Amino acid sequence: MLHCSRLRRYRSPVVSSTMTGPSFVSALTAGLALASTAAALPAGAQQERGFTVEQVRNPRYVRSGPLALAKAYRKYKAPLPEDLAAVVANITAAGLVQRATGSVAANPQEYDIEYLSPVQIGTPAQTLNLDFDTGSSDLWVFSTSTPASQRNGQTVYDPSKSSTASRLSGATWSISYGDGSSSSGVVYKDTVSVGGLSVTGQAVEAASTVSDSFTSESDLDGLLGLGFSNINTVEPTQQTTFFDTAKSKLTAPLFTADLKHNKAGKYNFGYIDSAAYTGSITYTSVNSANGWWQFTSSGYQVGSNSFVTSSITGIADTGTTLLLLPNAVVTAYYSKISGAKYDSSQGGYTFPCSATVPSFTFGVGTARVTIPGSYMNYAPISTSTCFGGLQSNAGIGISIYGDVALKAAFVVFNGGTKQLGWAAKTLS
């Protein structure tokens, strides 16, 4: 369901010098132990211009750990480790792939669901379901230029049916992936509406070639990048993201992600809904030089063990499923799960599905975000073995705080101050 919210309580992104708040350490909640040196948001004026996008369920999505991990490697242009590449090849050869993020024949029921966001493009509006991705900066879609052999039931954008579409002369786009595949095409300017807010002249990248990994995702019609515009791939002139184009129409240049475990979440643009989180919001600075929402975590904690202080540079990425961290962190975590091991036949860490899985906490300054153990159990790969939601970032070169982590908190992406805000919330 898609709707526009215009009269929610808005909290200013301007912060005070002190903050206090509750600490949440239970495996059933996301914890933010809020210290006095962190920043709190005071109540502000009524929000004037903002909107909400509620995700929609994709009923055919079933989790596959190896394929989710492989997708992250491809996205960040990293070669797949040999073990993982072999697993992906075997799954593909066996015909077990129903989607790029996969399903495993031995476990056909749904374990979690990918959620997409409806976006209207053109006049009259053509509705496509897109993946909101803070790890990229292109709004690209399947289109009538995409060969039939590269489509698999996706809804396509047809610029010829939009009275507001115009071809951007000489402009092309291309995104390459770590497995050597790519997606590319031409560019149109058109009206794009998200959550009831319309912007004109938005760059819409129409695919004429699509990577097989996207072709197999039959319900995914494209991506809406929410990274910084400096990594947009349009040539010869980069184009702005939808968020950057819409900034001038928003009360505040920010959006929030309130993703959920096993149900649809939502994105709010232009305002912070005070009812969506508990306690206060802790902010940390963002390094946008590489176009990502990149921040430095202050460390980690496994279950009730002591917090380990360690600077870990990572990206808050709504377009990546798993939590990918350095090997030392990963091995420390799985050493606390009976029967856990690196399984070369799966290309990642697995453990008995019956095992007790501890929570995982990461630091944001002096605050703490706790991911429940139930979130860390990503999906079964057999009737008795499960694939972990935490995997190694080896070969990628940076840590990725994907949906496994983001679902455990209310997250603010402030494009004005270039900060990420983290707050506790009630978890499902």
Question: Which role fits each region the language model picked out?
Answer:
Residues M1-T29:
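Classical eukaryotic N-terminal signal peptides for Sec-dependent ER targeting/secretion
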Residues T20-L128, T284, N414:
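Disordered propeptide/prodomain
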Residues L41-V62, P66-A70, R74-K77, V210, ...:
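Aspartic protease catalytic domain
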Residues T101, Q109-S208, K336, T361, ...:
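Signature of the N-terminal lobe/flap region of pepsin-like aspartyl proteases
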Residues Y111-Q126, W292-S311, S392-N393:
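A short acidic-Thr-Gly-centered motif at the start of a beta-strand
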Residues E114, V119-I121, L128-F132, L139-V141, ...:
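Short hydrophobic beta-strand that contains or immediately precedes a catalytic carboxylate
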Residues V194-N290, T383-S428:
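Aspartic protease core domain of the pepsin/retropepsin superfamily
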Residues D273, I312-C353:
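Extracytoplasmic, non-cytosolic globular domains
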